[in-house]
Amino acid sequence: MILLEVNNRIIEETLALKFENAAAGNKPEAVEVTFADFDGVLYHISNPNGDKTKVMVSISLKFYKELQAHGADELLKRVYGSYLVNPESGYNVSLLYDLENLPASKDSIVHQAGMLKRNCFASVFEKYFQFQEEGKEGENRAVIHYRDDETMYVESKKDRVTVVFSTVFKDDDDVVIGKVFMQEFKEGRRASHTAPQVLFSHREPPLELKDTDAAVGDNIGYITFVLFPRHTNASARDNTINLIHTFRDYLHYHIKCSKAYIHTRMRAKTSDFLKVLNRARPDAEKKEMKTITGKTFSSR
C-alpha cells in the first residue's frame, strides 16, 4: 500500500527554488500558481502587489471556520510566527516570505510551508488529544464537514479519543473494495497489538454517532479509529495526526488503484483469450480451380 505525502510538494519545490535563486543572487522572477489538493483545498502562490521579492502562499478550505472553533488560528500562529499575515481575498490563510531577508533554516521553513493543510487540520486533533491527556470528559464532539457530503467527528474520553469519518462510495464496486480494504486493517491489528482499533460500518452510523444527524444510505460508510494514550501522547501525536487526517484520501486512492489494476488484468486476460481463439480458428478450405480442359490453376 502507498502512503500519501502529508506535505505539498508543489509548495516545497516552488519555495525551495525561490530561496535558492535568491541566495545565489539571481534576479527574482514572477510566480503565479493556483492548484488544488484533496478535500476541495485550493492553493495560491503569488507575488503580492507584483513585488517579485515577496512570495505569498495562500490556502482555501471550505471548512476552515469549523477548524477555527478548535484553535486553528492559534496553532498556525505558533507554527508560522511572523510569516503568518492577513489572508488574501478568497483564501483563509496566507504566509508571506521575503526573498531579500532569507531565514537561516530555509529547509525547515520550506517544509513547514508544505505542511500548511496538515497544520490547519491539526488543531482539532491536538485539542481533543489534550482533553484525553487531562482526563476531561463531557466536552462537545467536534464535527468537521471536510467535504460537501462527508464529515469527521472527534470525541475524547479519559482513556481514548474516537475519530469517525463518514465517506460516500460513488459505485457499488467501491463499497465491495472498501470492505475488503478495511478487513485488511483488522487483520493488520492482529499482527500489531500497538495499532489503533479500526472499525467499519456500512449504511448505518456507529454507536458513537447515535442520536445525531449522521447520514444513512447504501453508499455511506463510516470508519472509526479508537486512539489510546500511546497514540495521542506528546511523542506520538504528530505522527498520528499526519496519518489520520489523510485517511479518507488514502482509502479512496487505493480503491481507485485497485479498480485500475483489476481493469488492467481483465484487459490482459481478454487479449490472451483472443490470441487463443485466433490460434484455434480453422484455416479456410482452398477450393481447386480447373479449366474446361481439366487443367488446374496454380497461384503465383
UniProtKB/Swiss-Prot annotation:
Location in the cell reads:
Cytoplasm, Cytoskeleton; Cell projection; Synapse, Synaptosome; Nucleus
Any Gene Ontology CC annotation: nucleoplasm
Modified positions (N6-acetyllysine) in chain numbering: 275, 295
| InterPro entries the UniProt entry points to | ARPC2 (IPR007188), ARPC2/4 (IPR034666)
Q: Name one GO molecular function term.
A: structural constituent of cytoskeleton
Tell me where the transmembrane regions lie.
none
Q: Which residues form the signal peptide?
A: none
Which controlled-vocabulary keywords does the entry list? Acetylation, Actin-binding, Cell projection, Cytoplasm, Cytoskeleton, Nucleus, Synapse, Synaptosome
What GO biological process terms are annotated to this protein in UniProt? Answer: actin filament polymerization; Arp2/3 complex-mediated actin nucleation; positive regulation of actin filament polymerization; positive regulation of lamellipodium assembly; positive regulation of substrate adhesion-dependent cell spreading
State the oligomer form and interacting partners.
Answer: Component of the Arp2/3 complex composed of ACTR2/ARP2, ACTR3/ARP3, ARPC1B/p41-ARC, ARPC2/p34-ARC, ARPC3/p21-ARC, ARPC4/p20-ARC and ARPC5/p16-ARC. Interacts with SHANK3; the interaction probably mediates the association of SHANK3 with the Arp2/3 complex. Interacts with DNAI3; this interaction reduces binding of the Arp2/3 complex to the VCA domain of nucleation promoting factors.
Report the protein's function.
Actin-binding component of the Arp2/3 complex, a multiprotein complex that mediates actin polymerization upon stimulation by nucleation-promoting factor (NPF). The Arp2/3 complex mediates the formation of branched actin networks in the cytoplasm, providing the force for cell motility. Seems to contact the mother actin filament. In addition to its role in the cytoplasmic cytoskeleton, the Arp2/3 complex also promotes actin polymerization in the nucleus, thereby regulating gene transcription and repair of damaged DNA.
PANTHER family, per database record? ACTIN-RELATED PROTEIN 2_3 COMPLEX SUBUNIT 2, ARP2/3 COMPLEX 34 KDA SUBUNIT
Family to which the UniProt record says this protein belongs: Belongs to the ARPC2 family.
Q: What is this protein called?
A: Actin-related protein 2/3 complex subunit 2
The organism encoding this protein is Bos taurus (Bovine)
